[in-house]
Amino acid sequence: MPMPRFFRSFALCLALVCASLLVTAQPAEAKVKVSFHSFNGSVVFGRYPHTFVVFEGTLDETGQAINENFGFTAKTVTPAILSGPVAHMIWVEEPKWIGKTNRHFTLTVDDAMYRKMRAEVEAWRNAPGKYYDLDNRNCIHFVGKIAQLGGLKVDYPKDLLRKPRSWLNRVTSLNPQLGAKAIGGKN
């Protein structure tokens, strides 16, 4: 028994709509968020003020989940830090500490930029010799380089080189397009 004309037209329209959805439906573009954090320091826990970056998201090309963080510091904290370059390391924060830090702002980057930023992390990790310098290559300079790769304006005023929160607040003010607000408190 032939299908009534109305049902044939309806079935054809439904098939066309479904086909167009299949053709135009694309997977959501995966991105990695890069958050810029500062830690105020804690006399109780023996921690100095610090700044670091957190990468979270999914790579578009592979679907790989990303959840990692990196900061730059001296391998050992001794008075030698005050007199010039010392041995360095990339510091990875424990997850329990990240929630207790200040998240200043977040950038969203594509796979290519994520790879550039990670290459920069590895360049600092594998720099030869004594690479950490309290006044010239500390955690602020490391995070600043990551921010610059992300297209942000960065500077390093001498009076902020040992004040990560204040320095990230300055980066926030230099980049109003972020829509971020300064984080208050001492440091």
Across the structure, where does each feature detected by a protein language model lie?
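Activation targets extended, charge/polar-rich intrinsically disordered C-terminal tails
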Residues: 32, 119-187
